[in-house]
Amino acid sequence: METLQTSKASALPGDVTGKGTHKLGLLAMAAASGIAVANIYYNQPMLGIIEAEFPGQSAATLIPTATQLGYALGLFLLLPLGDILHRKPLIVGQFVVLAVALALAAIAPSAWTLVIASLVVGASATVAQQIVPFAASLATPEKRGATIGTVMAGVLAGILFSRTLSGFVGEHGGWREMFWIGVPLALVAAVLMFVTLPHHRATSSMPYGKALRSLAHLWTRFPTLRMATFVQAALFASFTAFWTILALYLQGPRFNLGADVAGLFGIVGAVGVFAAPLAGRVADKHGPSFVVWGGAILTLVAWVVFGLWGAIAGLIVGVIVLDFGIQSALVSNQHLIYALDQQARSRLNTIFMTGMFLGGSFGSAVATVAWSQGEWTGVSILGGMLAIIALLVLVLGRNRSSAASSKHEGS
C-alpha cells in the first residue's frame, strides 16, 4: 500500500526556498540545471552540419540517440548516489566531468568518437536531475510543487535555448565551436553550485549496490511511480521525435531553411517555460494528477496541429502547445513521485527519469524511421500515437485505482 511520507520540517537550515537571499540559491539551482541539460540537445539543430563533415559515416545519425541513451544510463547508474552521498560535492564533480566530455566532443576526429563523447556528455549531464530532488528536499510540503516548478523552468529553458544557441553557432561558426562554448558554461555552473549550495546530509547509509537493487523494490511498491514513468516516457518520446526531425524538415525542399532557423524555434517554445511554475502552483492547489491529464491532452493537440498545419505558422503554434503540455505533465509527475518516500527521492527520480529518457531515446530513433518512410506526415502520426498511449495509461491507472478503492470499501 502506498504511503505519503512527508517531513514536518523538510526545509533544512540551508533552505534555498525561503525568503530574501535564499531565493537566489533556488534561482542558481534552476540556472545550473538548465546549463547541464542543455548539453544533450546541442547536437539536434546541428545534425545536418555534423553529417556533412563526416560523409559516408552513418554513425553521425546516432549522435542524438547516443546522447539520450547516455543520459538514461547516467540516470540509472549515477542518480542513486544522491541518496547515499553528500550532494554538493557530487553535483560539482559531475559538472567538471561534463566539461571534460564536451572538450572531447569538440575535438572528435570521427563520427564514432563523437558518438562515444555524446554518451559521456549525456551521462554527466544528469547532474541536472541531482539538483531537482535536492531542491524538493529543501522545500516545505506546501511549497514543493512551486519549488520543483521553478527548477524545472530552468531545465526547460536550457532545453529550448540550447537549440537556439547551437543552431546559430552551428550555422555561423561550426558545430565544434558550440561544444567548446559548452566547456566554460559547465565550469561556471560547477563554481556556482560550489558557492551557493547548502551542505546536505545523505538520506541513506546503504551501500551503492544495495541502493541500485532497491530500485526494483521501489518500482513494485508504488503503482503511482509506474504510471507516472510510463506516461512521461510516452510524452517525452513524442517531444524528442519533434525536435529530432525539425531541423531535417526545415532544411528540406519545402522550406530550405538552415540550422539557425531550427534553433530559433527554441525561443518560440520557451513560452512553455512559464508552464513549470504555473503547473507547480496548480498542482499544489488542485492536485498534480489534474495537471498531468491536461499536459497529455495538450501534447495530443499539438500533434494534431503539426499534422494538419505543417506550415511555419502551424509549427510555431504547435511547438508552444507541445512544450507547455510536456512541461506541465513533467512537473506534476515529479510532484507525485517525490511525495511517495522522502528518504528515497533520488532513487525514485532515477526510475522516473530513466524511463522518461529511454522513452526519449526511443522517440529519437523511431522518428528517423518515420521520417524516412512517411516524412512529416509519418512523424506527426507517430507523435500523436505516443500522446494517445500516454492518455491510455492514465485511463488504465485511474480505472485500477477506482477498482482498488471499491474493493477496499466493500471489504
Residue ranges and their predicted role:
Residues T150-V195:
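Helix-loop-helix hairpin linking two adjacent transmembrane segments in secondary transporters
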